[in-house]
Curated annotation (Swiss-Prot):
Residues 3-57 form the MADS-box domain. Expressed in aerial vegetative organs and flowers, but not in roots. Expressed in flower primordia. GO terms for molecular function: DNA-binding transcription factor activity; protein dimerization activity; RNA polymerase II transcription regulatory region sequence-specific DNA binding. Keywords: Developmental protein, Differentiation, DNA-binding, Flowering, Nucleus, Transcription, Transcription regulation. This is Agamous-like MADS-box protein AGL3. It comes from Arabidopsis thaliana (Mouse-ear cress). SMART domains: MADS. It is found in: Nucleus. CDD domains: MADS_MEF2_like (cd00265). Residues 186-214 are annotated as: Disordered. InterPro entries: MADS-box/MEF2_TF, MEF2-like_N, TF_Kbox, TF_MADSbox, TF_MADSbox_sf. Probable transcription factor that binds specifically to the CArG box DNA sequence 5'-CC (A/T)6 GG-3'. Plays an important role in the determination of flower meristem identity. Involved in the specification of sepal identity. Contributes to the development of petals, stamens and carpels. One of its GO terms (biological process) is petal development.
Length: 258
């Protein structure tokens, strides 16, 4: 997949510019060498860096000077001498104009940086002040637009985060509601099961009552008073105590405890 179209302009970052220059220079030298070997072509390549350092490549065994001389003879041999002189004069005039323009721009740049202001008169200083004010307004306007754009982006991100937060909160509430419903459903089922077990136990208790054990004291069979009275009636000596004995037996305590 291609990287897309690269905009050709000067790289502002100094380090990146140097790195790019080194990579592209080596690539260009390599391509020139490959072309000279593959196609048996005579190639001369001259590269000057922005610091003025020279990098060259020449495929001719005789060297760069001979190749350049060959190029000079080939280029100027077909030119008219009069036309060549006129072109050189025109180019020299263009060079002088460009040089003057560069000097004016450099001078103006130094003024904008606050340098060499002593040689300027009041009108020039006022003109420079208006230029600086216009530049400041332009800079502030650009800064304000940039800050507004950033603020708009931040608001958009904030709305997205709030929407995500609401979705997460809604999911959490639904999860809690489902968990609570499941808990109460299981509790109700357990209570219903316990109630059924209690109902089953009560019905079983009613259908099969427990056998009561005999008490510690058993009831007396028959009329104890009559038995004891008849027993004592056989003995005349005890006839007088029959009533007392009958009362003691019916009251469940002996006479000596009275």
């Amino acid at each position: 997949m291609g990287r897309g179209k690269v905009e050709l302009k000067r790289i502002e970052n100094k380090i990146n510019r140097q790195v790019t220059f080194a990579k592209r220079r080596n690539g260009l030298l390599k391509k020139a060498y490959e072309l000279s070997v593959l196609c048996d072509a005579e190639i001369a390549l001259l590269i000057f860096s922005n610091r003025g350092k020279l990098y060259e490549f020449c495929s001719s065994p005789s060297g760069m000077a001979r190749t350049v001389d060959k190029y000079r003879k080939h280029s100027y041999a077909t030119m008219d001498p009069n036309q060549s002189a006129k072109d050189l004069q025109d180019k020299y005039q263009d060079y002088l104009k460009l040089k003057s323009r560069v000097e004016i721009l450099q001078h103006s740049q130094r003024h904008l940086l606050g340098e060499e202001l002593s040689e300027m008169d009041v009108n020039e200083l006022e003109h420079l002040e208006r230029q600086v004010d216009a530049s400041l307004r332009q800079i502030r306007s650009t800064k304000a637009r940039s800050m507004l754009d950033q603020l708009s982006d931040l608001k958009t991100k904030e709305e997205m985060l709030l929407e995500t937060n609401r979705d997460l909160r809604r999911k959490l509430e639904d999860s809690d509601a489902a968990l609570t419903q499941s808990f109460w459903g299981s509790s109700a089922a357990e209570q219903q099961q316990q109630h059924q077990q209690q109902q089953q136990g009560m019905s079983s208790y009613q259908s099969n009552p427990p056998i009561q054990e005999a008490g510690f004291f058993k009831p007396l069979q028959g009329n104890v008073a009559l038995q004891m009275s008849s027993h004592y009636n056989h003995n005349p000596a005890n006839a007088t105590n029959s009533a007392t004995t009958s009362q003691n037996v019916n009251g469940f305590f002996p006479g000596w405890m009275v």
